[in-house]
């Protein structure tokens, strides 16, 4: 029998159409079977979790037992990135999106993670925590700061942990102050500075004495009593154990406890205390080096006997006294165990004697003083 041509064409078209439909269905099944949105979301969430963990969010926590599982999950996520990118290549081409999108996302996140781990790129949160940690460490250390009390006067303070400040050094401008002007300024403004800057005053017996600082020219301005006579401290500061540099800078001077005791109780039964007579006294031993060289042998021994004072002053303190030779001139005399006397020091009131006048007075009256009191 002859078959109908129209039927044959229809069968052929049906067979061809069914094949196309099957191919389309297979492609749709592939697209449907591809977990496009779900896997992308899960991959993104896994990468975010890895980024958060790597950025140091759990840096303060102790390492737990699940760290090995996290490493496995990371390696599994990395393998998923490579496998999913290969599986989705064909489907993304059909959908019109580039196949390199998941690869770019995965590589970008991986590069960021590597940067976080290597320290090249630090998140803002992590850098903020680091800065706060460094700031707290700096707070534990003693901080020094400088205050300009007035033009030409700079004071260096140290902030104490328990509150208040400690005075480290005082600097005077050589263009505006000489040695005597600096001492006069300090005598007049000592209490104001201590109160204004909340300076804590410590007990000399419980606090270690500071070492003499270096001045601007690199030489130690303050000499110890063992090496030679030092620049005299003002009488107001003798009880506090403070001394002064000669010109450029002033600082604390280490003085022995027996010296401070000597200033406080030096047998002034017949003579008022020096602080009540004149707030600022100077010693002839510090007037000038040339004046020292003109002193007698007994005076130089008295000036250089700081070591003996610290050793035997406790037993001999009752044998020292002060005589007022004339207004503004005070002589300290010491009686030795063998019955002889020695001249300890001569002090002049700055209100009545300048440096030149004090030196001139001593040259004129040295013989009389030795004959009268020794």
Curated annotation (Swiss-Prot):
It is found in: Nucleus. Belongs to the BRX family. This is Protein Brevis radix-like 2. It comes from the Eukaryota. Residues 65-80, 246-259, 267-288 have a biased composition (Polar residues). Its main location: nucleus. PROSITE patterns: BRX. The gene is BRXL2. GO terms for cellular component: nucleus.
């Amino acid at each position: 029998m002859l078959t109908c041509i129209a039927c044959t064409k229809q069968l052929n078209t049906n067979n061809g159409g069914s094949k196309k439909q099957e191919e389309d269905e297979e492609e749709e099944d592939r697209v449907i079977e591809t977990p496009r949105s779900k896997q992308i979301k899960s991959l993104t969430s896994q990468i975010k979790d890895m980024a958060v963990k790597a950025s140091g969010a759990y840096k303060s926590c102790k390492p737990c037992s699940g760290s090995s599982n996290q490493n496995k999950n990371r390696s599994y996520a990395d393998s998923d990135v490579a496998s999913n990118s290969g599986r989705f290549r064909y489907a993304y081409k059909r959908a019109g999106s580039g196949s390199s999108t998941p690869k770019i996302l995965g590589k970008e996140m991986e590069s960021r993670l590597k940067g976080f781990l290597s320290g090249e790129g630090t998140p803002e949160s992590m850098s903020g925590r680091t800065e706060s940690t460094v700031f707290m460490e700096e707070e534990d250390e003693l901080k020094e700061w400088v205050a300009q009390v007035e033009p030409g006067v700079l004071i260096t303070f140290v902030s104490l942990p328990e509150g208040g400040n400690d005075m480290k050094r005082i600097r005077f401008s050589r263009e505006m102050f000489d040695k005597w002007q600096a001492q006069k300024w300090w005598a007049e403004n000592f209490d104001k500075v201590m109160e204004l800057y909340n300076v804590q005053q410590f007990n000399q017996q419980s606090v270690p004495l500071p070492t003499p600082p270096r001045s601007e020219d690199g030489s130690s301005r303050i000499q110890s009593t063992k090496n030679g006579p030092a620049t005299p401290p003002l009488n107001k500061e003798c009880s506090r154990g403070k001394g002064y540099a000669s010109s450029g800078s002033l600082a604390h001077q280490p003085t022995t406890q027996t010296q401070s005791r000597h200033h406080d109780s030096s047998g002034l039964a017949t003579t008022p205390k020096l602080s009540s007579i004149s707030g600022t006294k100077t010693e002839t031993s510090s007037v000038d080096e040339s004046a020292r060289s003109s002193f007698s042998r007994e005076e130089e021994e008295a000036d250089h006997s700081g070591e003996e004072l610290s050793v035997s002053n406790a037993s001999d303190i009752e044998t020292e006294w002060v005589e007022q030779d004339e207004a503004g001139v005070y002589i300290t005399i010491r009686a030795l165990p063998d019955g002889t006397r020695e001249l300890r020091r001569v002090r002049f009131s700055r209100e009545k004697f300048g440096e030149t006048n004090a030196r001139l007075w001593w040259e004129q009256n040295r013989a009389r003083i030795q004959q009268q009191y020794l």
